[in-house]
Amino acid sequence: MFSVIGRGIKFSSKSHYSVSCFLIATQGAKIRQIHTHNTFFKNFSFAKLGRNQRTSSLIKIHNSSTSFPKSRSEKVVYTPSLPLSSSVLASFSFLPHNILQNGLNTLHIWSGLPWWASIAACAVAMRIAVFPIMLKMMKTSAKLAIINPKVAEHMSVLSKAKAEGNSELMMQATTQIQNLYKVNNVNPLNLLSAPVFQGILFISFFYALKTMAGVPVEGFTDGGFWWVNDLSQPDPLHIFPVANGLLMLLNIELGSETGSNKVAMSPSMKKFFRFLCLASPLFTMNFPMAIFMYWFPSNVFSVFQGAFLRSSTIRHKLGLPEVPSAMPVPNAQNESFVKSFTDIVHGVQEKGKYPQASEILDATRFLKTDTNNEQKPTNNSTITKATTLSDNSQNDKSSSVTKPTEKKD
């Protein structure tokens, strides 16, 4: 006869009827009753009650307090004289950020927690829910780290076969790599599942919290703590942006997302992520504090998750293989964090000092010289012909000069 949609009740019957709807309060002491008398409703919705009024007394909707529709095409919306807990949630949809907004609002209302604690609890709950996907990704990355030397050998053979144009050797190398993946039960695509899912979750939380802070939702202006009492405004001391960037850097150095710091990462990628973490406060300093109430606990969870998964006994119970201590990357030089950071700083200050930039410049210069040599083949050929002719003429002259004279008897 009716269905609950988002924050309201939608009546779908096409005839006049009488409905009594009872909503039981959280503490079970009092009952809210909505009673209607033989009146057709096309769409009936009511706002959720505020946190302080969730155990209020009996609410009755009478004909005197509600304007009923004159035709079936009209919509009747009854809004009680109670403050809205969130005007953002007035329309429900199945988009990820709207689902998160409704979930956060429900958790805040029925738990009684302040907004900062509700957002942090939701962040931890989401990370626990994503942990099975992360565990699958960690197993795949650990197995790939173990078989990486063999795969690198086959890949070198494959690259040589491509350069030589040997199709048979290429087929053999690819089949050997595929068999190596099948024997070890490894699918490299599993490495993308957790980052993609976490990326979608982070973007959804970011958009949901940014929208709620932009309204702002009731309770956001005083739902924080200490110097960050207003969650709709950025951190005035910029402590959370800096601490969040340092936590991300700590996760990269410890390998928290892979469960082990023994899994090798290319130096260029590590430098890039280090620079991104150190530069992140410049881009996040104007974010509202509601976003950091999700982001900061999520990074703290990652640190504890990495420490939890570095234990050999826990890895054995979870079925995670042990990664060898030394997993070298071919043609890579392991550099310390201080050296890589100083390289980045000198590369920004003085052009050409950054090692990777100098390598790229050398490669481009080499390509330019090759293209210039290829563009002038006729001149080179004429020069070589001229040199050969001159050499031949000089040889003929020398032979004629050095020809021994015959003595007459």
Curated annotation (Swiss-Prot):
Segments in the Mitochondrial intermembrane topological domain: 97-114, 210-235, 297-409
Family: Belongs to the OXA1/ALB3/YidC family.
A GO CC annotation given for this chain: mitochondrial inner membrane
Localization in the cell: Mitochondrion inner membrane
Sections of the chain in a coiled coil: none
Topology of the protein relative to the lipid bilayer: Multi-pass membrane protein
Described function: Required for the insertion of integral membrane proteins into the mitochondrial inner membrane. Essential for the activity and assembly of cytochrome c oxidase. It is essential for viability while oxa101 is not. When both are deleted the cell is non-viable, suggesting that oxa101 act as a back-up for oxa102.
Region (Disordered): 369-409
InterPro entries, per database record: YidC/ALB3/OXA1/COX18, YidC/Oxa/ALB_C
Name of the gene: oxa102
A biological process from GO: protein insertion into mitochondrial inner membrane from matrix
Chain segments annotated as transmembrane: 76-96, 115-135, 189-209, 236-256, 276-296
Species: Schizosaccharomyces pombe (strain 972 / ATCC 24843) (Fission yeast)
Compositionally skewed regions (Polar residues) per UniProt: 374-403
Name the UniProt record assigns to this protein: Mitochondrial inner membrane protein oxa1-2
